[in-house]
Amino acid sequence: MLMRKKKLLSRISFGSLFLLCGTILSACTWIQANLRNLLKETTGKDFDLSKAIKIPEGRQNLINSLKKSYEVNPKDTTKLLLDAWKQSSEEGKLGIADLDFDQVTNPTEKDPFKNGAKGRAFRHWISKY
């Protein structure tokens, strides 16, 4: 079981995860300010996130900086990314059209996430990024 988890985590691109969270972060000024401070503290670089997220080089720099920040300060980086994910989820801005969250929270049919379907849905969704 432990080996399966390691294989799954190794397949998931952290770059994709950081890009998704970086995109989410750029929308919220409070989280954006915290991200900017965290990145400046750990990498020594000052980012204009609203501009960086719009161009491929800026997104790649943001991803690399988030990775470096995670290596230096995993607790704060993880907390920041989870806060951004939570806020975006509450505002309905995750952009996951493949998952019908109403059906998940109030199922009228059989459970859509039985027998490993949740993992397959996540891998399918993350592979797009």
Swiss-Prot record:
PROSITE patterns listed in its UniProt record: PROKAR_LIPOPROTEIN
Q: What is its main location?
A: membrane
Q: Which GO cellular component terms, listed alphabetically, does the Swiss-Prot or TrEMBL entry include?
A: plasma membrane
Signal as a keyword of this entry, yes or no, is yes
Coiled-coil regions, chain positions: none
TM region positions = none
UniProt cross-references to InterPro entries, sorted A to Z: Lipoprotein_3
Q: Where is the lipid attached (N-palmitoyl cysteine)?
A: 28
Record lipid sites (S-diacylglycerol cysteine): 28
Q: Where in the cell is it found?
A: Cell membrane
Q: Family per UniProt?
A: Belongs to the MG439/MG440 family.
* Protein name stated in the entry: Uncharacterized lipoprotein MPN_654
Organism equals: Mycoplasma pneumoniae (strain ATCC 29342 / M129 / Subtype 1)
